[in-house]
């Protein structure tokens, strides 16, 4: 389907909703930033906002600098290879919402017939993607649906999506429960939720001594002013905590897939409406 404007096609426009009232609305009801809908709603007076904002600002700097990808194109290609088993295992098709999807790298693994939207609070990421990342990910050379929004207030109509995808983002949101309630709302009744993230203690629930020592060292270094060692995540759930979060918000977890590269430390949980 051709894009109606640079960042939204007719399908995406047809399912827009006010992120607060959830009432259907049009592009004209939103503020536009650099051609992109800005539907971001922040809980500035709610506990945790200041910590979230500090972490979000740090993440945005890292995202555009390519931090953690010293080998450039090859590092991004390795990332693709590490993620491939996930999407070989889960058949993500249909109408897809990628929450915290940034520049839409999930598209690298999707069927071309699927309809896709990414939402993310970092609107500027669209214009500041590292060139090495664009070279590695074929999908980044193609246009896609993008809206500036946060996970806690999704600007789409209820029951609009077959899949809601949440990869490496639930430990970055201010209110995880609200993010999952919104995922529940926008999913079709037979839709699926996929949550992927590092869990504290991994599959066994016990943090290895080496990891524990590293975490303590990083905490000490951040306390003495070395900001590059500061942990900017908003929380660190165990596998049990993550399952509880999912089920407490109306879902039934049906399958857990442990990403091979991360050796039982990163899990992808498939869930459906209970």
Sequence positions of predicted segments:
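N-terminal, positively charged/glycine-rich alpha-helical extensions of SAM-dependent methyltransferases
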Residues: 2-67
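Conserved alpha-helix/loop element of class I SAM-dependent methyltransferases that forms part
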Residues: 72-94
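Class I SAM-dependent methyltransferase SAM/SAH-binding core
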Residues: 97-153
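A conserved beta-strand element that flanks and buttresses the S-adenosyl-L-methionine
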Residues: 165
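A short glycine-rich, Lys/Arg-flanked "PGG" loop and its adjoining helix->strand segment in the class I
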Residues: 177-192
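Conserved class I S-adenosyl-L-methionine
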Residues: 193-221
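Short alpha-helix
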Residues: 230-249
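Core SAM-dependent methyltransferase catalytic element
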Residues: 244-274
